[in-house]
Amino acid sequence: MNIRRALFLSFALLAGVTGVAQQRLPSYPGVREGQAARQALASSVSLARTSGWWQDNFTFIHPVGNETFAFDARTGQRTALTARPTRPAAGGGGRQPGRGRQFTTLASPDGSARADYKDGNLSLTENGRTTALSQDGDEARGIKYGSASWVYGEELAQNEAFGFSPNSRYVWFYRFDESRVPIYYLTLNQRDPQSTLATERYPKPGQPNPEVELYIFDRQTRQTTRMQVRPGAFDEGVGHYIFRIGWLADGRLYFRRADRRQQVLELCASDPTTGITKVLQRETNPEGWVDGDFPMFPVGNDRLLSITERNGFANWAWVGMDGTVTPLTSHQAEVRRPVHFDDQNQVLFYMALDGKRHGAQLWRVGYNGQGAARLTDPELAHQVMPSPDGQFFVVTSQSDTVPPLVRIIDRNGQVKATVAESNVESISRAGYRRTEALTFTSADGRTELNARLHYPVNFDPSKKYPMILPVYGGPLGAFQTSWNPSFELPDSYCDYGFFVLEVENRGPSGRGVAFKNAMYRHMGRAEIDDMAKGVEMARTKPGVDGNRVGIIGTSYGGYTSIMAILRYPDHFHAAVSNSNVSDWRNYDTTYTERYMDLLERNVEGYDAGRAATYAANLKGALMIYYGTADD
């Protein structure tokens, strides 16, 4: 079912109507007027954006409808083109394995060999001859070479379980022993006359995890060597998880390893011929978890650009091949992806969330840590597209209240050209108010959080309107952000007479280690408490009916929705919960234990995060739904 449709059906009671059917929607009071207002809004309001590209180091191509313009970044001159140039092919992307899976066949870089996984074993084909790299693999027994456990693909983004070295000499591969991991049964094809049964080794909190080893086969010596992936036993210390595998410029295999609690993360390098392993970087967080999915970037042959959180925020650091770690930035805010590496001038351009309301800013800093400078206006948030040589940048700038503006700047932050401007003057003529930027204090009384309030169409402050919160609320991956200051047109729920409230909560990434740690061992507490505080703030706004508040979400957002209506029944009066995890004992180990700690160490926290604990509190309307093959 379409989520937005489901929300309207469930929340119809908030607006005072019942017996909803989709085909009767236009007959509801105010719906036709709202749809007409949306059409007027779409036809009269434009937000500046660009789907353009850099044709060369100084020419930016900007398509607008059937027209195309070229901007010369050196002079700022705009030229109308009679024909649209061919867009250069984009790098990256490509095929991906299925969710939670890994590739089953891979060719060597030089094309001289191919590795294949089948039925628990890995083989290598060279010059038409096939060599078995493993022989005792057996999927039925839970032994696999060249294929990973499901949690590795799903929770650690490991989409390769074997691979070649850049020079094609070595083949690395996993060995997994899942024999102690319980089997999970999943019924599929339930809409067909005959359903099917799928099985998966699926570890839940408190259960054994898959045991992992890492091997390298040398195509020259025909020898297989086991890498030293851990200093002790599998269940003791680091090396419980082995992931993010690749090759360094000096020929060593690198990987990340973590303990089961994921409070220690080490970047390691192994000699492919001896298996001897050296730790290059170690990060710890005894009060929470260490994110293991931050990318690394090789710079030259002797160092990597990596993330460290040692000052409480994600910052850049140089990691040497000898294991020395040298901080490069020291923001009291989190950095985001590099924008451009200028190796010739030894300058890094990157983004950092140090603007107003944690908006992303473009920064530059020398490779030696000197000359750090912000190049964008901290009152706004920015998205950046560098020219191929990094001399110019297309910057889209906006805030919660300032509509987008697209400009070209140089490497000193000087504006060279305006590419596109927004036209939002017609918002009020279409019957809408601009979205309002708000702040409120977190439930612990120590943290300022952000919010946005969307007003219903044709808003009359003398009337009362129901309010909806679309939510997620849970932890986020590397370089994702808990709040993004952006200018938003009124939400489509507003067309049907709803306020829409977006709220920030503690727990996700983007605002430092302490902000994340607020969720540790107690999912379902801090984020729900903060959303309730956001509702309390919004209830003071004219027109908000504090007795008709709904909440909707999917996945972790579904969990947030069900916990909100159960823990705060006087704040939330209807909830739509799609694909929620209602009890963390039933989710997988790798995700759950990262944020909730081990079950035996935190039974109280698991109980407190279980929806059924609060079932007796339900007062309002709760809708729970799943797909027919939810994993």
Feature annotation, model-predicted:
Residues 105-136, 160-174:
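Hydrophobic or amphipathic alpha-helical targeting/insertion segments
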Residues 48-52, 59-68, 78-96, 103, ...:
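Non-catalytic accessory segments flanking enzyme active sites
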Residues 22-47, 74-101, 125-157, 190-201, ...:
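Multi-bladed beta-propeller domains
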